Amino acid sequence: LNKTETNRVNHSPQQDVGAIYKDLDDVLGETARMLMAVVESEFGKQVNYDDMSAFDLRIACDLNDEEAEVVLKIAHEPNNLLGISPKAGAQSALRQWVEAGHQIVIVTGRPPETRDVSVEWLQLNDLPHHEILLVDKYGRYEVHHCQITTLDELRNRPFSLAVEDAPSMATWLAETAGFTVALLDCPWNRDLVSHPLIR
């Protein structure tokens, strides 16, 4: 990562008690609320946060494929990403884990061109971490891109805990990768099928 990233924590292996996977959007930041604002400004559709019963933006906001693509393109503009509010308690939770000796790995499914602005957002909001991974979670990107981590590479990481909001990703982490998953309570994941590794 950029040497100017002041919130990246120096990793001390002897202190390591397990790496923690921490999703970015809607785990550390209020991304869905920003997306709803974009949907309203572009298409005049008002969607309440608690009514977002699906992770898929097309279903949650009644958008067609083209409209959803427009929303995501606008949402990934630097000014919109930098304007996302951090989740309440996100900073204190990360600090407690770091103080306990955990390595914090921020994992996001954002496109590779958003890496720098994502790092900047973490820095601006004083969110400590050791590493950030841009993962092709949903098969959207060219996996040979030098900044993209594949799911196969991700499953070989030694995470003691993964914190997610996306139901499909939480299921994959538990069933395929065998990680213990803390599923953050969100309207779009409340109907997730139970799994012994998801809590």
Residue ranges of predicted features:
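Short catalytic/ligand-binding loop motif for oxyanion handling, primarily in non-cytosolic enzymes
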Residues: G29-A32, A37, A100, E113-V117, ...
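Active-site neighborhood of HAD-like aspartate-dependent phosphohydrolases
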Residues: K3-L72
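Hydrophobic anchor at the start of a short beta-strand
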Residues: L81, Q103-I104, H129-H130, S160, ...
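Short, acidic loop-to-helix structural element flanking the phosphoryl-transfer center
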Residues: H76-I106, P111-V119
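Acidic, Mg2+-coordinating phosphoryl-transfer loop and its flanking beta/alpha structural elements
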Residues: P158-R199
